[in-house]
């Protein structure tokens, strides 16, 4: 089972996820305890909702683009298996979001 890892090129304090070099409000993601969204120009189409159990797009969410959190694991709601189920490995939901949803690294 793969593990969530924060790329050495990114930083995250639990509230903001941004590149270590060249960070701007346009490539920084923020988490306010419910929503994960770009720091600048957030819309319902690029905002995700996290309720403590599911991570899904605010707009047009379905079982194929939603993730389920169970204990210290995050996995796709649909067709999950050992290769697409990740251990949080001590990282926040924002780091997991950057790795498995946005695929930033």
PLM features: what roles do these ranges have?
Residues 1-105:
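Repetitive, compositionally biased segments used for assembly/scaffolding
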């Amino acid at each position: 089972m793969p593990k969530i890892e924060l790329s050495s090129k990114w930083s995250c304090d639990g509230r903001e996820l941004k590149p270590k070099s060249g960070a701007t409000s346009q490539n920084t993601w923020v988490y306010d305890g419910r929503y994960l969204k770009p720091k600048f120009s957030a819309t319902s189409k690029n905002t995700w909702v996290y309720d403590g159990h599911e991570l899904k797009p605010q707009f047009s969410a379905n079982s194929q683009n939603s993730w389920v959190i169970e204990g210290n694991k995050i996995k796709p709601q649909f067709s999950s298996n050992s290769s697409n189920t990740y251990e949080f490995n001590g990282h926040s939901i924002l780091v997991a979001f950057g790795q498995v949803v946005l695929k930033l690294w």
